[in-house]
């Protein structure tokens, strides 16, 4: 029997890196509302008392960067100096320039179908049938813990909570099946007045127990709740935040490979983002079709070239048909050229701020989570 542990982590919307991601994607959304053809690469840096928004943007749109940045920070919950960061009073610096004309000539084409990739690179997509959303369980539940922390904080159930938090879930496997939770780590920023005893009890009862399946918890499960004993200083006052530093949290929690490209602040012409979404869409449809229990897709692109330079399918011994057939089906049923995948997934819409916390995958509101190709894939593979 094969026994092992696997762990994934998540961070809250108030984590400094996630503040930066949300600001970058809020800028992208506001631009796409006005200018669907915009080219956006927006990066954000946050630290005590300041937010710096920079990058390369070519657009006909006008966005009030300062007010938008302040609104995002306040929406997250940083709206009073007591928290060490205040969206109303922090400095907002704007260092945005235009996208290089050298890149433009490689991407833009007279025929939209010939639109080239915005850069070279490799992208991975993954799906597994171990959860109902066809995502790895550890990252799924780590995200749900963070969503629950935000919910009880914002609704006032636990009014002493503050926006910055992290979670980590370690699952026990036997023969690749989950048999329980080995350990849970949950660290949450809090106000100075709450006792550690009350914090531990409240986090356990209001955050952990409502989220994790009861049948996975046992007397052997270990809980590490604010293990340093104090977490009052947090957010950008505790650590600086940068766009694109939580790429494993954003994807599969380490259960699949990653091409290295971050998502937030990038318009869909950047295949770092759009092709990673397409790869998830392909992998999820293969698993939903019952063609494999686990599936990983690798795509690669060359700057200025429309067609992928490679497509790889790996099913880790769980495939019901040969991987070579799956590659052929991917080529037949999915248009993975930049223009094709943007159209296939309807990516030119202002949906990106919502992706910037709690994971880009496994959330049914996003178009790359559809399984609308599953039946035709199964039929084409010859499975009844």
Swiss-Prot record:
One Pfam family from the record: S-AdoMet_synt_N
Source organism, top-level taxon: Bacteria
Pathway as given in its UniProt record: Amino-acid biosynthesis; S-adenosyl-L-methionine biosynthesis; S-adenosyl-L-methionine from L-methionine: step 1/1
Binding site for Mg(2+): 17
Gene3D superfamilies, per the entry: 3.30.300.10
Any single GO BP term: S-adenosylmethionine biosynthetic process
Cell location: Cytoplasm
Main location: cytoplasm
Catalysed conversion reaction: L-methionine + ATP + H2O = S-adenosyl-L-methionine + phosphate + diphosphate
Residues binding L-methionine: 56, 99, 239, 270
GO molecular function: ATP binding; magnesium ion binding; methionine adenosyltransferase activity
Stored InterPro entries: ADOMET_SYNTHASE_CS, S-AdoMet_synt_C, S-AdoMet_synt_central, S-AdoMet_synt_N, S-AdoMet_synthetase, S-AdoMet_synthetase_sfam
Enzyme Commission code(s) on record: 2.5.1.6
Note accompanying the cofactor annotation: Binds 2 divalent ions per subunit. Binds 1 potassium ion per subunit.
Region described as Flexible loop: 99-109
Keywords: ATP-binding, Cytoplasm, Magnesium, Metal-binding, Nucleotide-binding, One-carbon metabolism, Potassium, Transferase
SUPFAM superfamilies documented for this protein: S-adenosylmethionine synthetase
Family named by the database record: Belongs to the AdoMet synthase family.
Described purpose of this protein according to its UniProt entry: Catalyzes the formation of S-adenosylmethionine (AdoMet) from methionine and ATP. The overall synthetic reaction is composed of two sequential steps, AdoMet formation and the subsequent tripolyphosphate hydrolysis which occurs prior to release of AdoMet from the enzyme.
Name of the protein this chain belongs to: S-adenosylmethionine synthase
Source species: Pasteurella multocida (strain Pm70)
Native organism taxonomy: Bacteria, Pseudomonadati, Pseudomonadota, Gammaproteobacteria, Pasteurellales
């Amino acid at each position: 029997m094969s026994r092992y542990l696997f762990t994934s982590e998540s961070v809250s919307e108030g984590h400094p890196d996630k503040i930066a991601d949300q600001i970058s994607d809020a800028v992208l959304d506001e631009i796409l509302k006005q200018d669907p053809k915009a080219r956006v690469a927006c990066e954000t840096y946050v630290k005590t008392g300041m937010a710096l928004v920079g990058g390369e943007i070519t657009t006909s749109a006008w966005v009030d960067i300062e007010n938008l940045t302040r609104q995002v920070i306040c929406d997250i919950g940083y709206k009073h100096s007591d928290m060490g960061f205040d969206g109303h009073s922090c400095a907002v610096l704007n260092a945005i320039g235009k996208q290089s004309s050298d890149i433009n000539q490689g991407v833009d084409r007279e025929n939209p179908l010939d639109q080239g990739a915005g850069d070279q690179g490799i992208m991975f997509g993954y799906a597994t049938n171990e959860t109902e959303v066809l995502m790895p369980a550890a990252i799924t539940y780590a995200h749900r813990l963070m969503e629950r922390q935000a919910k009880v904080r914002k609704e006032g159930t636990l009014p002493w909570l503050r926006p910055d938090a992290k979670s980590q879930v370690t699952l026990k496997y036997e023969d690749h099946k989950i048999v329980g939770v080995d350990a849970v780590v949950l660290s949450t920023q809090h106000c100075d007045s709450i006792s550690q005893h009350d914090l531990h009890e409240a986090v356990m009862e209001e955050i952990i127990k409502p989220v994790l399946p009861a049948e996975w918890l046992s007397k052997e499960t270990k809980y590490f709740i604010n293990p340093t004993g104090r977490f009052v200083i947090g957010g950008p006052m505790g650590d600086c935040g940068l766009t694109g530093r939580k790429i494993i949290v954003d994807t599969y929690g380490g259960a699949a490979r990653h091409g290295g490209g971050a998502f937030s602040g990038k318009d869909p012409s950047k295949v770092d983002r759009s092709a990673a979404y397409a790869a998830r869409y392909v992998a999820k449809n293969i698993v939903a079709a019952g063609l494999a229990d686990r599936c990983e897709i690798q795509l690669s692109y060359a700057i200025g070239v429309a067609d992928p330079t490679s497509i790889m399918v790996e099913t880790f011994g769980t495939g019901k048909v040969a991987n070579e057939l799956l590659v052929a089906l991917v080529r037949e049923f999915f248009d993975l050229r930049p223009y094709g995948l943007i159209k296939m997934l309807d990516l030119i819409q202002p949906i990106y701020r919502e992706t910037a916390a709690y994971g880009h995958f496994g959330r049914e509101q996003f178009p790359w989570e559809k399984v609308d190709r599953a039946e035709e894939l199964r039929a084409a593979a010859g499975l009844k």
